[in-house]
Amino acid sequence: FEANLQLKNLYRAEEVETICSCTFLNACQNYPLLIGQQTNLYKCVLENCMEMNNPMGYTGIICPDGIYEDPAGTTFREVLYKKLRFHFQYVNTMKLFSEILHWVTYSTNIIGAYNKDLDFYSINNLYLPQTIDGCLIHDGSGLCGGLKNENGDWNTKAHKKRLIRYDKDKLELLSNVFEEGGTKSCPKLVSIHSQDILDVLKKIEAYPLHVRDFKHIITVCFDETGAPKAGLIKRETHQPNIEYYDMIFNGPHIYVANPLSKTPRKECVVANRDYDTIDLNEISIDYFSRTNYRRLIPTEEYKSYIKGFVEGQDNDGNQIYGNYIDYYKLGFRNMMSQTGERTLICAVLPRKTAHIHGVRSVAFRNGTDTVDMAGLCASIVMDFYMKTIGADNLMPSRMQSFPLGVASKYQSALYSRTLML
């Protein structure tokens, strides 16, 4: 810059423009509905549209669906839902926008005058715009269909049940099922494919007990980056001895109700590819898969590293904790695939085993609660629940909202089936 004054001035001009733009877009007096959010041009333009819309007119905007999914967007949604008339969500699989990736979602939104009563229509999982017209005129006959048709192609067929009319009661349903009732009038707008799904959600809403109502611990055990730096574990593929607390699980090890789904190869380099599927019919009774990690600290220190439940007090009044690693726990894959065969994947992990943060586990004070949750979370009902949410990661708050506590008349069958698997 010292040698080229013109280049310096050009840089300074760009810097001033960028800083001023960011300051303007993040100023609360300019965009009060976006306070507490990560702003972007789409959100700012959407707020401008709501402010400038003529009471007798309508405004249409195409934008990403982030505002409907942002946990910090409750204030924005509370105003938006009162002005929203139509929300049509697309998945770009037909490449209507060739410059963005095929899995990106976006929506067309029609905004009108402020309406004190919530009342708008929504269609999700659209691939072509002509499906909208068909849904509006359909007579309701026949089956609605899913995301794909019987030939495995993306379903562009219209059906009356694809059209969801949202009012105060339906938004409260979403709030109760997915957000513990904390945002009655402005919950996140999850992807509801058809009206039939709302009936299923009503059943889930009516479930009386949840994980949060039971004594439990949720943990990731060891962070894949932090734990090696702290000298707790190291990356090394080897055959573990469970009795010596050698087994450390990661995501690919487990599948639905199966902690022995895959084993890493002796040379495991590529995270999700260097694994072989385990044939459960061929392995011996004492077989166990390899692990990619080796513990570096003494057994007693390792066992007590993650605190369990309080078991009493010592002579000085200090609390005595159990060892979490010594519990049976239910391990979940932390990363969830919304397009895979199953989204919610979990299995009961044996005592004396741990895992890295690619797995998130829960243990209960009462061991039967662990079996209860294992059975429920292996079901297609809970898998449907997570697919409806559309989340890519399983967070503790979401796990705490899972239904739990099966009626006694079903327990015997559920427990025997779950433990047999």
What kind of feature is each model-predicted range?
Residues F1-L421:
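S-adenosyl-L-methionine
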